Curated annotation (Swiss-Prot):
One of its GO terms (cellular component) is cytosol. It comes from the Bacteria. This is Translational regulator CsrA1. The keyword Repressor applies. Coiled coil: none annotated. InterPro entries: CsrA, CsrA_sf. A translational regulator that binds mRNA to regulate translation initiation and/or mRNA stability. Post-transcriptionally represses the expression of genes controlled by GacA/GacS. Binds the 5' UTR of mRNA; the mRNA binds to the outside edge to each monomer and each dimer could bind the same mRNA twice. Recognizes a (A/U)CANGGANG(U/A) consensus, binds to GGA (part of the Shine-Dalgarno sequence) in the 5' UTR loop, which prevents ribosome binding. Overexpression represses target protein expression; mutating nucleotides in the 5' UTR abolishes repression in vivo. It comes from Pseudomonas protegens (strain DSM 19095 / LMG 27888 / CFBP 6595 / CHA0). The lineage of its organism: Bacteria, Pseudomonadati, Pseudomonadota, Gammaproteobacteria, Pseudomonadales. Disruption phenotype: Increased expression of genes controlled by GacA/GacS (aprA, hcnA, phlA), partially suppresses a gacS deletion mutant. Double csrA1-csrA2 deletion mutants fully suppress the requirement for GacA/GacS in control of its regulon. Decreased expression and stability of RsmY and RsmZ sRNAs. Induction: Expressed at low levels during exponential growth, considerably more protein expressed in stationary phase (at protein level). Positively controlled by GacA and negatively regulated by CsrA1 and CsrA2. Belongs to the CsrA/RsmA family. Keywords: Activator, Cytoplasm, Repressor, RNA-binding, Translation regulation. GO terms for biological process: mRNA catabolic process; negative regulation of translational initiation; positive regulation of translational initiation; regulation of carbohydrate metabolic process. The gene is csrA1. GO terms for molecular function: mRNA 5'-UTR binding.
């Protein structure tokens, strides 16, 4: 595993087409932006695990 240290506003490039930028840090939470081609799937880990398990996202419609 490659471990890098970045400051807000700095980026990491993966290959020629993917850029990860540190947008902000607040406490233990880090906001990142990911710029990738549309044919590259980008998911949070918990969403990816649900996809792999064949589960769908919870219904976000409100009930009266």
């Amino acid at each position: 595993m490659l471990i890098l240290t970045r400051k807000v506003g700095e980026s990491i490039n993966i290959g020629d087409d993917i850029t990860i930028t540190i947008l902000g840090v607040s406490g233990q939470q880090v906001r990142i932006g990911i710029n990738a081609p549309k044919d590259v799937a980008v998911h949070r880990e918990e969403i990816y695990q649900r996809i792999q398990a064949g589960l769908t996202a919870p219904d976000k419609r409100e009930t009266p």
